[in-house]
Amino acid sequence: MGHFVVQGDLPWILCSLRLVIMIIAGKVSPTSSDALFSVPVPSATSSPPEVYLPATFKLSNTQLAFFLQENRAPSYGSQRGHPLQRSESFVVFQTKELPAVNISLGPFTQDQTLSKDLLQPSSPLDIPGRLTVNWKVRAFIVQSRVYASNPLVQVLFYIAGRDWDDFKIQDKLPCVRLHAFRDVREIKTSCRLQGNLAQCLAQLDLPSTWFNVNVAPLGRRKSSGTDGLELTGETLQVELYYTLHDPDSNDECGESYPRRGGPSRGESLSQQPLLRIGSISLYQPSQEQLVVDKQLDKNLFLRLPERPLKPGETLNIYLLLVPNSTVEQFTLKVKAKKGVNLLSTKSRSNQWRVEWDMQSGAKHSIATVEASKIKGVSGDMAGSIEIMQLDFEMENFTSQSVTRRINWNIDYRGQNPTSDAEKVVTELTVVQKDIQAIIPLSMDTEIINTAVLTGRTVAIPVKVVSIELNGAVTDVSSSVQCKSFNEDIVKVSMNCDYVFVNGKETRGSMNARVIFSYEHLSAPLELTVWVPKLPLKVELSDNRLSFIKGWRVPILPDRRTARDSDDDDDDDRKVSRGCTLQYQRAQIKVLTQFHTTSSEGTNQMITMLGPDWQVDVTELVQDSLKVVDGRVAELADRTVLVANELGSSTLKVESPLAVEAVLGETQFSVVDEKVSIVELRVHAISGLALNLQPSPGNSHTMVAKATGLQTLSTLKQEASFSIWVYYSDNTAAPLSMYDPKDYNLNGTSADDKVVTVAQQPQQRWPVIIAEGEGTGDIVHVEMTISETCQKTKRKSVIASSSVFVKVRFGTDEDSEEDMEMETEIDTRMPANTRRPAIDSNVGGAGYEPSNEQPASVPIDYTNFPTISNPEEPTEEDEEDDEFVHSPRSMTDLEIGMYALLGVFCLAILVFLINCIVFVLKYRHKRIPPEGQANMDHSHHWVFLGNGEPLRTQSDLSPQTVESPSNTLEGVQTCCHGDHHSSGSSQTSVQSQVHGRGDGSSGGSTKDHGEDASSPTSKRKRVKFTTFTLPTEDLPYNSIPIANEEDIQWVCQDMGFQDQEELHDYMRRIKEIA
């Protein structure tokens, strides 16, 4: 009876549960039936693909400039990109004019020139109307030691980084003021930068008071070397600084060459900061000239001046005896080359007698000097004794300088101690001019070695000038010799006119040296050499390329036939009409850092621009990019990786100089997997805006920010598209990366009064033309398979999307306001994609397609338009053109709701199974209509009525002890009444009683003599008993009665008092059934 109540209320229960499930699902699911897949929530384990405005950036009017990329990765969860914006950092190293940044996207281009203030924030070399971004003033001290006998300070200034062929601004160069400080005293002078080298020599005469008595006199050098002086006591230091200032009204510096220092009258103090040059040492002059000693043997040595000689000058050379020597006589032979004449020889000691004889030849002159000690004359044996003085004359010559040699030989005439057999040679330098020093000047002080990447030599011109005592500056570049200190860092040309790198260098240096020599003088040229860090960092936008489901492309002759699959089980791979599935493509970017070693010799690496920046060198090495296995992939447009067939390979950057040398590489694979297009994001672009600004935190770098505009402000104005394709493997790529021959892009307008869509012959994609004002998702774009790959029954649409369009005509002021608003990006752009089906075999990480709003604007996922699906595909189309959706991670709320929903579904399923089992059992227990011969099972019938029963109670049921579960006894116990119904139905009952399946009637076990434990006795334990009404025309009904407890529950629950009430209740049950 209870089962009937549940069965009758089952539809109401199912409807209630259904309503509850729909309400719960509506709270956690989007309103659109497809939005659950099209707008997933952000995943906690994967970030969305980075998108940007796919515009092309270029730098022009530069000699050396790079785009940059920051090493610092964006913080987790931050907005990684915007499809209508793109920012690129860049740096300009060398330029002759103001650089310009160009951006282009489709038919739109935008150029902007960098302002001088942006490129050159502040510089003391600022010249009105001229660009001096690379200019640097360099200063060289001619002599670091100044003697009181010649207290002249000379400093050479020149501008490095300036083009030496630029003669237009020589008259606009500034003045340089030299400051000399000793304690609190200061003197200064000025000179004007001029000439093609933009150089000048500043000279200062130091006051004699600066050379005080505290300075120790010079000592003599006892060694024959020329490395330096052995000075006694401490020396005084003078600090040198410089400032820049403009010329006066007379185009002069005001302090041409003031001797004895001091500012000019009426001159104001310099407002420029003092820039340090270095320091010089002051020395008190001695009574003797600066000389050098040259040892002849263990007994005798020569003393001669160290300075260069002038033509016609007389040279005095002294011969001395070492202390405690026992030599008493010797013969000195002097052999001099042509140009050096021995004028005279005289004794310098009263202890020695000197005689000499001269013999002149064509090439040489030989003098023989006899020296003997005078007996009886005593002297100081503890000190050195000057024996004689030899005077030589330097003849005139025509060259700039010459070197004269004199050979010395001592003969003791057989007396002890014996003489040394080796001859001693002294070299004398004779110069036409009194040159103080030579100074190498390079046009720039730094070399960025891009030759390692390109194979093209990078060279810097070099000039060498000589500085004379009188202040003359002479170019001696054609007469110098040169040599690189380390050719693994920098090299120098054979003519010494430039230094260069050719790509074979292995390292850099902060002080790379090239030595230049001129006559007896030499000087180093110091440079900073930057080299790229190897291996290069080769980046791919996607290093795992897969098939794109549903996108078929023609097999061109240059495409690999291996892409054609013969697998008949995979219909999407089967090729018909010469077509195959498209592969994903990847964008290539090559990055590096330029670095050098420190000047301290510790091999500490110093990175150009700091460790936070990487330099984009893709344009430099794009000709050296190569795929190792060309069958797997190839390059398109030199920077796009195109897959050809399955496999793994390496993309490498080959060295342009060394065979089989690799500068950098990265691995990639073309896998036998399929990804689907989960979103086609399309934006209408009506123009481009470009903004240039300095990079925050770095004064050398700048940022170019491009923004795509959306508003159409004039009639017939055209707009193009910016399209990104999102894949189910959590990657995205601009559609412009793919060949336009591999797809068709069609656009339609929902309102031709606002915009129309037309295909221009010169344009890759359709264009939007403004016809009237309006806003909304007016344009619908479909991406279809190329015509050669379409099938007659195959749906060719790969993906589709609605495009947000805004047309507003107005004045120029309104347009400027729109530009400002569009710079902040319109957040109402939709992203719709056609997705016919879901393939559970292809999966990937979740992504966040709607990443278009700024961080401060929340995203309303429920406002996305419904998915465009204009026609229902056939079963064959769905099977062939099936799309894949990317599984995504769910939030905790969704996991909980879906778990609860699953429990409800499981409970409903269990309930339905229980009902089905019950119905099946119930149908098997029905009594067939009258006339049916037999039944499969025997039943015991309980008669309710006023007539006599067919059998007695003992015949209808077994004894209680034999069958405790006797059904009739259960009725007696429950109802406490007679076993007769209120109607006369004896005949009817008798006609409805049938025998058992074995042919016997339903009697007790006693009548048949069966044992209670026999298998047949179990057939008497009937669960259901059927009662029939007296009229045979009425349909029969059955009453299920389970056991005694069930019957007691039904009787007590219904509260029947007599048999009439029970009969009425049974009639109602029949009507309900």
Swiss-Prot record:
Q: Membrane among the record's keywords?
A: yes
Q: Which residues lie on this side of the membrane: Extracellular?
A: 34-899
**One annotated Gene Ontology cellular component of this protein:** membrane
Membrane topology of this protein? Single-pass type I membrane protein
Composition skew (Low complexity), residue ranges: 982-994
Among Pfam families, the record links this protein to: Ig_TMEM132_2nd (PF23481), Ig_TMEM132_4th (PF16070), Ig_TMEM132_5th (PF23486), Ig_TMEM132_6th (PF23487), TMEM132_3rd (PF23039), TMEM132_C (PF15706), TMEM132_N (PF15705)
Any idea which UniProt keywords this protein has?
A: Glycoprotein, Membrane, Signal, Transmembrane, Transmembrane helix
Q: Tell me which family the UniProt entry assigns to this protein.
A: Belongs to the TMEM132 family.
Query: Could you identify this protein by its name?
Result: Transmembrane protein 132E
Report which gene this protein is encoded by.
Answer: tmem132e
